[in-house]
């Protein structure tokens, strides 16, 4: 542990800067969801074809999270952060300039590489940089940065894209990253690598059936969500026939409802995590089934989005709590795996949505997304009954 000799103010500033970085990294992952139609238009492509960009990004992050974590495990953290930020910013400049769709995809792969390394080291960095005795708060700040990406990052990115073109959105994210990088260079001390967990802990984690079951649940439920969510923007405009502005409002509502979800989880998550997660999966299932019927009216879609946003936030937080509770001895590796598995789900959902939109009809994304959601609901009830107490959050000694 690096001895924390700096003032509390500086310690918090460091953590806040990391949280802002988390916000930026997650915004760029999700922002194409709000820009699909615009990108498709500028390259004369079908919206459904552009969606493959989400899958490529998510799967690169999923595949590279663990290898990158192991490759960089001995590197000094400050240098590593600066390096990955430079890659991140350069790739955004390339996105801004992308002269065809392939170049855009290549630039996104560069961003995904930076993303994979960033997520495998930030949680442990936030804990190290936090003021004494404030580890849990540091982690929750990081989680807030992540959550705000869905709540604010995506809709703001879409609004910028609507008024100034999607390229400007990517440029703005790159600019935000540059400012954050300058703050990190100024604020961060040298951070030699610590025991970040090595491959040795992998077999140990794979031998925990409860943890593996949570990972499986994560991938299935995330696939269900992203099957519909990836194409919500063209769905609102093409299938439901509402305006581009309403699509923006809907993304804001969906994200904003996540705040309600996180407050609910904060209040009830410690005691009733399992019940809360299963109920949220049931709620997600209902939202997906009702997506097409609700598309008759803007009000119905807006109300549905509130419940959908609450559900997905509770699911995401609940899974994280369970993973941390089941792997207190190897948090880096367990969270890196979690991030990888989450991204496999994002990529799979976006791919399923893409295939449905191309070969069936975009109006079916909700119904077909409901199939994995139903599987997830049944699976969650089974595993929470099998491992009831072990899965609730253990009191942390932070």
Swiss-Prot record:
Keywords for the protein's UniProt record, in alphabetical order: Cell inner membrane, Cell membrane, Membrane, Sugar transport, Transmembrane, Transmembrane helix, Transport
Signal peptide: none
PROSITE patterns linked: MFS
Membrane topology: Multi-pass membrane protein
Subcellular location: Cell inner membrane
Membrane spanning stretches: 15-35, 50-70, 81-101, 103-123, 136-156, 169-189, 209-229, 246-266, 275-295, 301-321, 333-353, 364-384
Molecular function via GO: carbohydrate transmembrane transporter activity
Single GO cellular component term: plasma membrane
InterPro entries attached to this UniProt entry: MFS, MFS_dom, MFS_Efflux_Transporters, MFS_trans_sf, Sugar_effux_transptr_put
Pfam families: MFS_1 (PF07690)
Job description of the protein: Involved in the efflux of sugars. The physiological role may be the reduction of the intracellular concentration of toxic sugars or sugar metabolites.
Sequence similarity: Belongs to the major facilitator superfamily. SotB (TC 2.A.1.2) family.
Name used for this protein in its record: Probable sugar efflux transporter
Species of the source: Enterobacter sp. (strain 638)
Taxonomic path: Bacteria, Pseudomonadati, Pseudomonadota, Gammaproteobacteria, Enterobacterales
